[in-house]
Amino acid sequence: MDVAYICEWDRRPRTSHCPSIPLVCAWSCRNLIAFTTDQRNEEEKDITNLIHILDTEHPWDVYSINSGHQEVITCLEWDQSGSRLLSADADGRIKCWGMTDHLANSWQNLVGSEVDGDPIVALSWLHNGVKLALHVEKSGVSSFGEKFSRVKFSPSLTLFGGKPMEGWIAVTVSGLVTVSLLKPNGQVLTATESLCRLRCRVALADIAFTGGGNIVVATCDGSSTSPVQFYKVCVSVVSEKCKIDTEILPSLFMRCTTDPARKDKFPAVTHLKFLARDMSEQVLLCASNQCSSIAECWSLRKEGLPLNNIFQQLSPAVSDKQPMILKWRILSATNELERVSAVALPKLPISLTNTDIKVASETKFYPGLGLALAFHDGNVQIVHRLSLQPMAVLYGSSLRPSEEPSLKRQRSPTPCIHFKALQMSWTSLALVGLDTQGKLSILRVSPSMGHSLDMSTSLRHLLFLLEYCMVTGYDWWDILLHVQPGMVHNLVEKLNEEYTRQNAALQQVLSTRILAMKASLCKLSQTTVTRVCDYHAKLFLISISCTLKSLLRPHVLNTPDKSPGDRLTEICNKFTDTDIDKVMINLKTEEFVLDMPTLQSLQQLIQWLGDFVLYLLVSLPNQGSSVRPGHSFLRDGASLGTLREMMVMIRIWGLLKPSCLPVYTATSDTQDSMSLLFRLLTRLWLCCPPHNQRLIT
């Protein structure tokens, strides 16, 4: 584990240099980081609570939102798509922020809810029923469906037809649970209910979900002598109103409080976290005093309830069916640690079967198996999520500026700089921390936790995680932190091999993702950087092709035949004539009729296609030079076939509106440039054998 980079903001006056409020941060699946700060005016009377959005790939470009929260922001939560963000404050107000036009630097407040005057201590989006499991045991198989299996999991609430209903759930300090549901028409249904009849103060809380569609809420009043309470929450819609039902579940006392030797040593519970949002059976607890902490991991299990002999004698049949009860059992506990300041849990849904854990241990594949603890002395430690045994450590001294004199640090009466907020990336290969000075640090977490591995094993680990991001659509920037320049070529080749082993339908779905993934990988090495522009050009070509084909409409509605775009592809592949007009007469030209203003608005895209075809044909004599942009296109039959289809489509549109055609400078006024380019392009396309016609090279 080491430092990737540190972001330092503009210096503030000493009185407001250190943030006066607890910092909150959240990491989305798009590798966008949201975090909060408070901003004082010159008189230091009014405080503005800001939300900052930062792209980890461009940390120098931070977008700040004036949240409008009058009180301190206590919670931030991204949705599963990474395009919406929830913020909640100490006044009970919850706001939902959404991207404007899919831009990471443009956000607006969409909807919201409030529990007036009741601070929010826990917040979560409702579960959408989508859950994957990564099987390390099957990392060597070819099928993505076996590597990343779909786990049966019910949404928290469903609409007609089983579609998951969107919304969020929050827990307040006074023991209330509030649920807001987003209806398809934009209406918000909100309901509030007490977790139990006897309401009590809630200092810490967390939310998790069960496979049956229920919600589990864990609460604690902050005292280690008090029990940690658990509640089952069921949400439903009755007569267009949101209804909440709660039920008390078994509670637990931390083991450190039941040990006579340590009964009063750790008076406060400082952290309460479920190990995963969709794993309500395991919880992490941390108790602390002024100087030290202790962490415990608990698991909820079904156990048989022993019956008294009297009941067994009265009814022998009863003894055959032993009643089962739910009971919390401690899995592991740490020794006395430095005082914990922040906890980060893994988001990677790795399978925790005995076989998968054994294979992960043998191959030194640890993403998803470790959780991070930040301490008040500035250190950060990764511990195993089940055994709580140390796996890696980063000392706080490596985070301090090297130019700062050590004597100055020793004499400083101020507390040591440490992280107040900590979050893991979605592949568990990076950490983000916000310290007491407001600095943001990105830390690299090695997949092997520092163990030395041979090159093939390291490539297999990174390939497995890249495949996971390809299947889920998550951003893979944090994986690139661990890719060395010498790995790029082999990684790209192996990624392409695994992609081509999938069925045709899945390849079509993943075609653009693997292009984007290869482009980002090739940027990391000087030997492959020239291929980056080819991948971006292919992405742009696919986008233009999909856009233009989507404008076509069948002449007769409700026809069971193929769509016009599919027929265009079929005809162009079937007729290999070099004469564009002979290919065009086999199409139903009435399907290509568009409005004149629409055709004219496409002229810029049409011009790009024409220029690109011209560039490829001009560079054909230099095809032996692999460093020239466009080199891979000359051997890519599928991309050349797509260009042929676009040329035929443009030819038809040119008959309707000649001004939309691409403009060329010809040597003769009578020369048909479109026909000439199509003839040369077709000859080049025919040189690509059918078994080499693929979209990705």
From Swiss-Prot:
Keywords: Activator, Nucleus, Repeat, Transcription, Transcription regulation, WD repeat. WD repeats lie at residues 68-107, 199-241, 264-308, 622-663. It holds the Pfam family Med16_bridge. Gene3D superfamilies: YVTN repeat-like/Quinoprotein amine dehydrogenase. Belongs to the Mediator complex subunit 16 family. GO terms for cellular component: mediator complex. Component of the Mediator complex, a coactivator involved in the regulated transcription of nearly all RNA polymerase II-dependent genes. Mediator functions as a bridge to convey information from gene-specific regulatory proteins to the basal RNA polymerase II transcription machinery. Mediator is recruited to promoters by direct interactions with regulatory proteins and serves as a scaffold for the assembly of a functional preinitiation complex with RNA polymerase II and the general transcription factors. Component of the Mediator complex. It is found in: Nucleus. This is Mediator of RNA polymerase II transcription subunit 16.
